[in-house]
């Protein structure tokens, strides 16, 4: 046969050896773009997805540079986490100034919607472009949104600013964890990541307290101005201290564009927006049977089906390569984080309501009474990170965390109007310890069991899942709370308008009612809050079941590094 391809009957036959050449070229191209992933695409087993046992930590920092980067990342996480809940106590003053009561729901949801929607696509940006510049770009967008919120003269401007801030915030949480992977050797990574992630929980708890203090003593605009100096410090530290590294995946511009999965992103973003709008509006702003809610859920289902189909078709170039979800450690960790975060945010939102409505504290005092939850969370996040670093195991700590969270949720559901400090302090310490121990572990799993090329996408996935769990179940808890309180009022106090009582808020209860009516309403508030805690019990128990699928296998600890002893 000649060296020239022959055409016979409309068929093309390659010369000898050409098929081998073409196949080798295709394999080499895919390996260049996805050097770890392509070899394992059809396997999906955890033990085959584990990163090499020895991997150079060439970008690791030590001394004051490591301290500066850690502080800078903490500032970023603190600011983005504050924005989740800080606006809650400022809403009454904002609506009074802008005469915008109908826009109240958008002040919180605009930030949440864009944050959740862009978190997963940011994983691809971190894969194909230098982490430093993607991170600083996200920080700039977040700061721009905060600046718009601070100076806006209108309600529409505030909503726009919140949405812009969310676009940047969606890339900062996962980006902070990725910078840690670049700066800290693997054996020390859990301790650093645990401390940084504990800042998220701390900021989420104290944000309403800070928002109330700014609103009462300075201006509600400082709820957003506060982000500017913190963000500036973070930007300066990251710019001068964190060295620019090559992208995780080396590829041409065309390959990068394909790897960003524009079609998948175009279906994923509106799908998440539809889901979150439906869960936030349903039962609160509109009845669940309202055409708008049904349409949103329908659109979500259609868009999600399109997204899944596109991911299966795109495979390695997908926003979320299907291969990543085949390993039980990955999908088990995702389910664990989804449920545990949902339980945590249920308590973050409704424990202050219990203090204010049932025990008659002010918003500021309720924040102070949440300190046992905050302090225990931080302490056990650090302890958990150190123990995981020392033992190399994360499975046992995930089980212990979920078991403790289930017990703590059950104990908190036993609170009543006459509960003493010993009860609510002790129960919060147990809850904070359990959440602190397990909150960061899903990220540890992906960062210690996957190849380096998969870490940005998998880290973004875990961040997205945790944010989504909090967003969805806070909305579910809100509906449980409102429906239970309204039902109790209609049954025992038919002369009162349930909507008026709910809209008045927990801090106005004692100013509006007295005597037997107040006593009855306090008991009803207690009952409604406890029903949200029942939801948290179920979520904590579900996280325990998810933790049972995680393999008890030591993660790599011995990483070669010039600074290692």
Swiss-Prot record:
One of its GO terms (cellular component) is plasma membrane. It is a multi-pass membrane protein. Efflux pump; part of the gene cluster that mediates the biosynthesis of aurasperone B, a dimeric gamma-naphthopyrone. Its main location: membrane. CDD domains: MFS_Azr1_MDR_like. Residues 38-54 have a biased composition (Basic and acidic residues). It comes from Aspergillus niger (strain ATCC MYA-4892 / CBS 513.88 / FGSC A1513). One of its GO terms (molecular function) is transmembrane transporter activity. Residues 1-14 have a biased composition (Polar residues). It comes from the Eukaryota. This is Efflux pump aunC. The keyword DNA repair does not apply. Gene3D superfamilies: MFS general substrate transporter like domains, Multidrug resistance protein D. The keyword Transport applies. Residues 1-57 are annotated as: Disordered. It is found in: Cell membrane. Belongs to the major facilitator superfamily. TCR/Tet family. SUPFAM superfamilies: MFS general substrate transporter (SSF103473). The chain crosses the membrane at residues 59-79, 103-123, 128-148, 164-184, 194-214, 222-242, 257-277, 293-313, 335-355, 378-398, 399-419, 425-445, 457-477, 530-550. PANTHER family: MAJOR FACILITATOR SUPERFAMILY, MFS EFFLUX TRANSPORTER INPD-RELATED. Keywords: Cell membrane, Membrane, Transmembrane, Transmembrane helix, Transport. Pfam families: MFS_1.
């Amino acid at each position: 046969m000649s060296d020239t391809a022959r055409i016979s009957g409309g068929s093309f036959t390659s010369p000898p050896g050409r098929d081998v050449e073409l196949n080798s070229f295709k394999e080499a191209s895919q390996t260049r773009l996805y050097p770890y992933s392509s070899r394992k695409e059809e396997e999906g087993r955890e033990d085959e997805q584990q990163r090499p046992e020895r991997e150079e930590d060439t970008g690791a920092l030590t001394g004051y540079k490591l301290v500066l980067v850690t502080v800078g990342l903490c500032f970023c996480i603190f600011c983005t986490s504050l924005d989740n809940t800080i606006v809650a106590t400022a809403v009454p003053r904002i609506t009074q100034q802008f005469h915008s009561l109908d826009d109240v729901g958008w002040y919180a949801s605009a930030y949440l919607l864009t944050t959740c929607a862009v978190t997963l696509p940011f994983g691809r940006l971190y894969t194909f472009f230098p982490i430093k510049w993607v991170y600083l770009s996200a920080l700039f967008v977040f700061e721009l949104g905060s600046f718009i919120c601070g100076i806006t003269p209108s309600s529409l401007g505030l909503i726009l600013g919140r949405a812009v801030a969310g676009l940047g915030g969606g890339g900062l949480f996962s980006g902070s964890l990725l910078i840690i992977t670049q700066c800290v050797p693997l054996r020390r990574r859990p301790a650093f990541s645990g401390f940084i992630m504990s800042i998220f929980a701390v900021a989420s708890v104290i944000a309403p307290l800070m928002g109330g203090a700014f609103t009462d003593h300075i201006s509600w605009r400082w709820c957003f101005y506060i982000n500017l100096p913190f963000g500036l410090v973070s930007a300066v530290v990251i710019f001068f201290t964190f060295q620019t590294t090559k992208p995780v995946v080396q590829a041409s511009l065309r390959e990068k564009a394909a790897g960003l999965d524009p079609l998948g992103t175009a279906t994923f973003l509106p799908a998440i927006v539809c889901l979150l709008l439906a869960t936030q509006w349903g039962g609160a702003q509109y009845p669940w049977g309202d055409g708008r809610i049904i349409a949103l859920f329908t659109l979500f289902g259609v868009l999600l089906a399109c997204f899944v189909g596109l991911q299966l078709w795109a495979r390695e170039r997908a926003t979320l390569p299907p291969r990543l979800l085949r390993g039980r450690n990955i999908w088990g960790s995702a389910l664990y984080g989804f449920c545990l975060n949902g339980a945590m945010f249920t308590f973050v939102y409704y424990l202050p309501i219990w203090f204010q409505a049932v025990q008659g504290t002010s918003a500021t005092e309720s924040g102070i009474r949440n300190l046992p939850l905050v302090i225990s969370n931080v302490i056990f996040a650090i302890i958990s990170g150190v123990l995981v670093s020392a033992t190399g195991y994360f499975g046992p700590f995930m089980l212990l965390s979920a078991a403790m969270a289930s017990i703590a949720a059950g104990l908190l559901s036993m609170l009543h109007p006459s509960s003493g400090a010993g009860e609510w302090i002790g129960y919060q310490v147990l809850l904070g310890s359990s959440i602190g121990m397990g909150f960061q572990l899903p990220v540890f799993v992906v960062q210690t069991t996957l190849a380096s090329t998969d870490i940005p996408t998998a880290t973004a996935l875990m961040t997205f899942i945790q944010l989504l769990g909090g967003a969805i179940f806070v909305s579910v808890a809100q509906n449980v709370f409102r429906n239970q309180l309204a039902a109790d009022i209609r049954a025992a106090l038919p002369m009162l308008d349930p909507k008026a009582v709910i809209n008045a808020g927990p801090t106005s209860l004692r100013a509006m009612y007295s005597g037997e009516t107040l006593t009855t309403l306090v008991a009803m508030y207690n009952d409604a809050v406890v029903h949200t805690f029942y939801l948290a019990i179920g979520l904590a128990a579900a996280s325990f079941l998810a933790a049972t699928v995680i393999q008890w296998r030591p993660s790599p600890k011995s990483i070669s590094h010039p600074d290692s002893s």
